């Protein structure tokens, strides 16, 4: 009986996961995708930020844009905005959650007047497949030291 209940719980969990992914990220629901993210804008000291969270709480990303009034308002002299803290629940990777969050972060940067965005990848903190994924997302990668790459993209 216990084995049956454990199997049933596992099946129900998988069904729930597939249902969530299907509802939120399947192309059948494109008209709802704009409403499936919460964007919180904040003014910080010397920069504006946007926090983007998908409403199913499967992932999030942040964007920082230095104030245009600063003398040096470009990030590492390369970009108008920094995208950071892109995170997707490991159980939902491969379903397009990260791509949608990254695209929305780029869109938010564009709405804030940015023409280029950048992010950093560090091999000590992040698997190499993430660097390859950013390159597939049309980011140009340049090594900055033994461990770090700067990735940039024109919007």
Model-identified regions with their sequence ranges:
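Feature marks short, highly hydrophobic, charge-poor N-terminal signal-anchor/signal peptide-like helices
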Residues: 1-10
């Amino acid at each position: 009986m216990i084995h049956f209940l454990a199997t049933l719980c596992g099946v129900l969990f998988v069904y729930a996961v597939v249902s969530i992914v299907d509802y939120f990220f399947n192309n059948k629901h494109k008209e709802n995708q704009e409403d499936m993210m919460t964007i919180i804008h904040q003014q910080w000291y010397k920069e504006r930020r946007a926090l983007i969270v998908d409403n199913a709480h499967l992932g999030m990303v942040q964007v920082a844009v230095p104030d245009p009034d600063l003398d040096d308002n470009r990030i590492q002299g390369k970009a108008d905005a920094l995208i950071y803290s892109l995170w997707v629940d490991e159980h939902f990777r491969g379903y397009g959650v990260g791509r949608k969050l990254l695209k929305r972060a780029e869109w938010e940067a564009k709405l804030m007047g940015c023409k280029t965005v950048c992010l950093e990848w560090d091999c000590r903190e992040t698997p190499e497949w993430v660097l390859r994924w950013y390159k597939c997302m049309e980011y140009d990668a340049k090594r900055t030291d033994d461990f770090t790459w700067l990735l940039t993209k024109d919007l």
